[in-house]
């Protein structure tokens, strides 16, 4: 009986150790802030807008939200909050979202990569 219990305990330990959670499990990790506008997904670029003298009229408003681990699937839906205004950016493929008294630049995936690449090149040239 003692051997059987020892064997059962060992099997349980081995099985339990093999059931570790994957920290990169996409369904449970926070995603980059993003919003769906006009059927297009816009992602946070990490940059604030430098445009001054705005008209003050919003082009739209984020009206619904999903969990921070999800991707928005409806227009005017984000994964970071709602009741937030936005304006279309001066660069095609961008919108600017007013948050925390700053205008944050969001862009489609392709445009976001361009912006980040250009910014990276600017940093390299100034060093």
Regions from the PLM with identified roles:
Residues 1-4:
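Positively charged n-region of N-terminal signal peptides that target proteins for export
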Residues 7:
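Short basic-aromatic helix/loop recognition motifs at nucleic-acid
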Residues 13-16:
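C-terminal motif of bacterial Sec signal peptides marking the signal peptidase cleavage site
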Residues 18-20:
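Bacterial signal peptide processing site
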Residues 26-94:
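Mature extracytoplasmic domains of secretory-pathway proteins
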Residues 98-127:
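C-terminal partner/receptor-binding element of secreted or periplasmic proteins
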């Amino acid at each position: 009986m003692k051997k059987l219990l020892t064997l059962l305990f060992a099997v349980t330990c081995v099985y339990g150790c093999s059931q570790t959670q994957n920290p990169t499990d996409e369904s449970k990790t926070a995603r980059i802030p993003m919003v769906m506008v006009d059927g297009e997904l816009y992602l946070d670029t990490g940059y604030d807008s430098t445009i001054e003298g705005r008209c003050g009229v919003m082009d739209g408003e984020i009206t619904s939200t999903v969990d921070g681990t999800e991707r928005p699937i409806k227009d005017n839906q984000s994964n970071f909050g709602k009741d937030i205004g936005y304006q279309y950016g001066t660069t095609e493929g961008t919108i600017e979202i007013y948050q925390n008294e700053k205008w944050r630049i969001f862009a489609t995936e392709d445009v976001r990569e361009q912006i980040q690449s250009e910014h990276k090149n600017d940093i390299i040239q100034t060093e």
